[in-house]
């Protein structure tokens, strides 16, 4: 990147301000965004179900009052008995995998049989596939759009990491070069000056239209500085200049300075400022537009490229500075699909928040901590943190604090704020809850971002899991947004600690530091009931997401979107129902992805017999303890 001092005239024609009616908010937001001491509740792992060991299988006999929950130990338990009762009853049971190996799957069988039941009085149940059928969207195009968006994001991030494999990251302090002339940023003078409006800056670009990232296959992007603040500089690629006028870039800058930087600095940390200019570059460029084919159902909205943090001796395309690349306004479709002016500018702040979270985490793990690019966070947790950043900015903009258990009316008081920062994460979590047991929550078999809808579900799990973790274990009071000081948890996760831990090990490290169960299997057991028990009457506090009322929000989205997927039901997670009744004799075969759970509900409206549940492999054998299977039970009635 070269920073030149002359200031050309600002091109462009005025554009009419777009007005978006509230009724169209949901359709517009169906395109995804880019890419201390603490006290907490006693986890359910502390409350083990009573066991009975006799001839044959080890049994667990449930003796729970409404609102009670318990956990069956990880190994050896094969039979769960629900005793006979003289009144109505309802139990929610989660069969959970604690495997931490991405891509792993366990095949299980649950037999449910009432005492004295004759064989096959009730037809055997078949576990539903719990995948989203093509017609569940109402419009098949919506499904293709979401899958294409996920696939494009996956392709870029995979290529970006591959491009810097083996490259050395820059360090925060670099020696001044012998020649102080016009050079690229990684050869800048020791004390460069901040940019000024009208300056010309030349960036190197390594991202090709096919989303390949090549450290050597670069071309220059000449841009002009349009707005400068204390922490950000807005620059416009001259290739697409002239569309955004009338103070719109200044408005974007104001939102970044006012809403994004203070929040993300508290939750994630400060950028390293490796180019010493005091700002993060926000580059609106057709480079981003060209990554979307003209006939695509979606579009890339922006990205952060780790190559910009690499030593230029290893990656010639490195700009040696902090840069966020954002979609340029292109109403005439010169570069790809048309991009309305308002679409590019109003969506920019949310995309910038997401990508800035990636950038700060990457710098803390490489530039500042002396790590390599192999220290970058695993995909599932990296995306969970970045999507959480969107929520923090949205809550700040709505003046909401953690722990408020906000419903739809409070969250959507500003439809624009809700649609930009909050709605996308509810949609992702709904995809997860439609089929939690099939979701690759830790990524694919190579710990990468999975393809299509599975990627959205993985991100939904990560966002919801971190939201629950912070709600349960953050230190009370003193938080940046008011309420709990949850930013300490996210700040610790983003950096990875002295050893730059990643993924599950990183979560375990931070959980221990903040009073949560420190072993992944125990943390998952504490989490297991949350997706189905949040805001369920009588459910224990440990099962609650305390900042948002999931049932209220999902019911409202189901109503507002008229059942459009993933909000086809008023609550997306539907347990497999098995009656507590005479004659119950059911067999359910199901699969369980690593670190996920399968949800059952056993219910009677009156007196009921004893029902015995037997959990085995699909071959009818005892489940090996190596599979990390646990059973978590909550009585709700």
List each language-model region with its residue ranges.
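N-terminal module-boundary/linker segments of secreted carbohydrate-active enzymes
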Residues: 45-269, 273, 277
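Structural helix-adjacent loops and short alpha-helical linkers that scaffold large soluble proteins
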Residues: 396-402, 472-488
């Amino acid at each position: 990147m070269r920073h030149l001092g002359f200031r050309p005239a600002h091109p462009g024609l005025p554009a009419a301000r777009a007005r978006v009616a509230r009724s169209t908010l949901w359709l517009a937001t169906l395109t995804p965004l880019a890419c201390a001491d603490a006290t907490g509740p006693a986890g359910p792992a502390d409350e083990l179900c009573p066991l009975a060991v006799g001839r044959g299988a080890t049994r667990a006999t449930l003796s729970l009052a409404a609102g009670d929950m318990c956990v069956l130990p990880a190994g050896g338990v094969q039979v769960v008995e629900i005793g006979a009762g003289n009144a109505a009853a309802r139990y929610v049971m989660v069969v959970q995998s604690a495997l931490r190996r991405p891509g792993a799957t366990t095949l299980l069988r649950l037999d449910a049989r009432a005492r004295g039941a004759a064989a096959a009085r009730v037809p055997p149940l078949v576990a539903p596939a719990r995948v989203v059928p093509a017609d569940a969207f109402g419009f098949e195009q919506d499904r293709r759009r979401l899958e294409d968006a996920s696939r494009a994001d996956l392709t870029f991030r995979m290529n970006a990491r591959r491009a810097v494999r083996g490259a050395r990251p820059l360090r925060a302090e670099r020696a001044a070069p012998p020649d102080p002339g016009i050079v690229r940023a990684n050869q800048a003078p020791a004390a460069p000056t901040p940019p000024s409006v009208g300056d010309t800056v030349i960036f190197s670009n390594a991202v090709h239209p096919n989303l390949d990232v090549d450290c050597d296959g670069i071309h220059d992007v000449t841009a002009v500085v349009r707005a400068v603040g204390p922490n950000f500089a807005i620059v416009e690629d001259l290739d697409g200049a002239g569309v955004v006028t009338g103070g719109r870039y200044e408005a974007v800058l104001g939102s970044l300075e006012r809403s994004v930087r203070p929040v993300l600095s508290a939750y994630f940390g400060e950028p390293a400022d490796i180019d010493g200019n005091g700002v993060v570059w926000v580059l609106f460029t057709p480079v981003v537009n060209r990554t979307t084919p003209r006939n695509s159902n979606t579009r890339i909205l922006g990205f952060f490229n780790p190559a910009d943090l690499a030593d230029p001796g290893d990656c010639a395309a490195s700009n040696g500075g902090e840069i966020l690349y954002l979609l340029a306004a292109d109403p005439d479709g010169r570069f790809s699909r048309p991009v309305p002016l308002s679409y590019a500018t109003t969506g920019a702040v949310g995309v910038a928040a997401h990508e800035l979270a990636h950038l700060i985490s990457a710098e803390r793990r490489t530039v500042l901590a002396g790590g390599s690019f192999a220290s970058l966070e695993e995909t599932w947790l990296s995306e969970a943190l970045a999507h959480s950043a969107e929520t923090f900015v949205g809550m700040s903009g709505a003046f909401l604090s953690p722990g408020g258990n906000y419903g739809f009316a409070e969250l959507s008081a500003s439809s624009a704020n809700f649609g930009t920062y909050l709605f996308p994460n509810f949609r992702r979590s709904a995809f997860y809850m439609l089929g939690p047991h099939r979701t690759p929550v830790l990524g694919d078999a190579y710990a990468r971002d999975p393809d299509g809808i599975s990627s959205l579900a993985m991100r939904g799990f990560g966002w919801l899991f971190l939201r629950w973790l912070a709600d349960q274990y953050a230190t009370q009071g003193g938080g940046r947004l008011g309420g709990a000081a949850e930013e300490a948890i996210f700040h610790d996760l983003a950096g990875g600690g002295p050893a730059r831990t990643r993924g599950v090990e990183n979560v375990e490290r931070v959980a221990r530091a903040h009073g949560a169960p420190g072993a992944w299997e125990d943390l998952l057991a504490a989490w297991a009931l949350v997706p189905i028990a949040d805001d369920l009457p009588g459910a224990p506090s440990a099962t609650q997401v305390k900042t948002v009322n999931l049932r209220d929000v999902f019911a409202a989205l189901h109503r507002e979107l008229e059942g459009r997927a993933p909000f086809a039901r008023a609550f997306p997670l539907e347990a497999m129902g098995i009656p507590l009744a005479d004659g119950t004799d059911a067999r359910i075969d199901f699969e369980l992805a690593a670190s996920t759970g399968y949800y059952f509900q056993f219910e009677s409206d009156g007196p009921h017999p004893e029902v015995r549940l037997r959990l085995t492999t699909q071959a009818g054998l005892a489940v090996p303890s190596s599979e990390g299977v646990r059973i978590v039970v909550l009585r709700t009635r």
